[in-house]
Regions:
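Acidic, metal/cofactor-coordinating or nucleic-acid-engaging core segments within structured domains
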Residues: 82-145
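Short alpha-helical segments and helix-capping/turn motifs at coil-helix boundaries
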Residues: 55-61, 130
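Non-catalytic C-terminal interaction segments of nucleic acid-processing enzymes
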Residues: 123-208
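Short, glycine/acidic-rich beta->alpha junctions
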Residues: 51-55, 123-126
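Acidic-basic catalytic patches of nuclease active cores, encompassing PD-(D/E)XK
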Residues: 1-52, 64-65
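Short, mixed charged/polar active-site loops
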Residues: 54, 68-71
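Conserved catalytic cores of phosphodiester-cleaving nucleases, focusing on short active-site segments
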Residues: 59-61, 70-78
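Short catalytic/ligand-binding loop motif for oxyanion handling, primarily in non-cytosolic enzymes
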Residues: 68, 80-85, 136, 153-157
Length: 208
């Protein structure tokens, strides 16, 4: 989260308000090309049915692209996992647990039907659904889950989990820019993984 904050804070005075690496990444898809930041909210919580913990994105950003808005859930990684696989997340739940209702809501938002989710990391489902939910709330016509990875080789296990999630969503995981999923979500959903360098002193200074 620190690296993410530095990257975005250091870009706030730029013309587009987006970190250069992110801007370059977004420019590789027609639905996000030329994005400019409208608002960015760190640790935004998004409600879903079922109670329990809300979906808290590391950063939620609303971007403007020509004549439309894009809702972006940004998840930072630096060696940590995407929470538990769904199978483990559901293990030993009580009869009164809201988790089944929460998972059903995520399935509906992401148009997953009865697809097997046992080995899918729960956080990836939650954050991508949050991007779609916030798109609905703010009238955005596109949603994006963006993973900004700062951990280098330490993030390889998470990259593998992201690839498994992309397979679930019927899209590629190795694109150099955002990829549109094959699921028929209420607004087009894009996903993307971006490897980023750690902050250096000039970047830290710009963020202060």
């Amino acid at each position: 989260a620190f690296e993410l904050a530095v990257a975005w804070e250091s870009a706030r005075s730029t013309e587009r308000g987006i970190p250069p690496a992110v801007a370059e990444f977004l420019d590789k898809h027609e639905l996000t090309r030329g994005s400019r930041l409208v608002i960015g909210l760190p640790e935004l919580q998004v409600d879903f049915p079922g109670g329990g913990h809300q979906s808290q994105t590391d950063l939620w950003a609303l971007l403007r692209v020509r004549d439309h808005l894009v809702s972006v859930a940004v998840e930072a990684k630096s060696g940590e996992a995407f929470d538990k696989p769904v199978e483990e997340w559901l293990k030993d739940i009580s009869p009164n647990s809201g988790k089944p209702a929460r998972l059903a809501a995520l399935r509906e938002v992401l148009c997953l039907g009865e697809t097997d989710l046992a080995q899918i990391r729960y956080q990836l489902l939650h954050r991508s659904a949050a991007a779609v939910r916030m798109a609905e709330e703010y009238g955005a016509s596109v949603a994006l889950l963006l993973v900004q990875a700062f951990g280098g080789t330490r993030d390889q296990p998470s990259r593998s989990d992201f690839s498994r999630f992309a397979d679930l969503m019927l899209c590629a995981s190795d694109s150099e820019g955002p990829t549109r999923v094959g699921r028929s979500t209420c607004v087009p959903l894009l996903v993307g993984w971006l490897d980023c360098p750690t902050a250096v002193e000039p970047t830290l200074a710009d963020a202060v």
